[in-house]
């Protein structure tokens, strides 16, 4: 939330999805330059009982389809459903995957044999950048309004 889709509190409904300006184009641009596209996202709404993991998966499937149609195939969506103060006991844990910890990024590196030194992560909060750097990946903080303009300063 906040990088490829607009940050609406606890997004899980497809009807609430709004793409950040230039997001689809930015991802297609990165893909055209040889980058694999992987998403890592905290989804504490699951731990808080606002929605279920299946809702996250449905939304991610929809996003993946739209992005694929835009020339930006997502290799994998990693998400963390945990929050140590969650109300759903199963997910109310202090895990290794919730950013700013690097667990999801490390898992992606392992699963897809990613070279951290030739990779980068764009996030909308310092915890995203911290997670990237803890995994040996360059992190960039996106605070603008157009992701394509931003990514062209990186690639």
Question: Model-found features: residue ranges?
Answer:
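Short glycine-enriched, charge-decorated loop/helix-capping segments at active-site entrances
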Residues: 9-18, 51-54, 91-95
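Active-site neighborhood of HAD-like aspartate-dependent phosphohydrolases
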Residues: 1-38
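Asp-based, Mg2+/Mn2+-dependent phosphohydrolase catalytic module
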Residues: 54-76, 85-121, 125-155
């Amino acid at each position: 939330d906040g990088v490829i889709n607009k940050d609406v509190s606890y997004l899980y409904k497809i009807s609430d999805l709004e793409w950040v300006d230039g997001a689809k184009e930015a991802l297609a641009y990165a893909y055209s330059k040889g980058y694999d596209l992987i998403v890592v996202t905290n989804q504490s709404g699951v731990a808080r009982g606002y929605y279920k993991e299946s809702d996250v998966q449905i939304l991610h499937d929809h996003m993946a389809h739209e992005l694929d149609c835009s020339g930006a195939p997502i290799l994998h969506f990693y998400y963390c459903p945990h929050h140590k103060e969650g109300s759903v006991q199963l997910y109310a844990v202090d895990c290794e995957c919730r950013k700013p910890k690097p667990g999801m990024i490390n898992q992606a590196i392992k699963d897809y044999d990613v070279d951290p030194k030739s990779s980068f992560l764009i996030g909308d909060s310092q915890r995203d950048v911290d997670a990237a750097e803890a995994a040996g990946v360059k992190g960039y903080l996106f605070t603008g309004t157009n992701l394509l303009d931003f990514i062209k300063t990186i690639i």
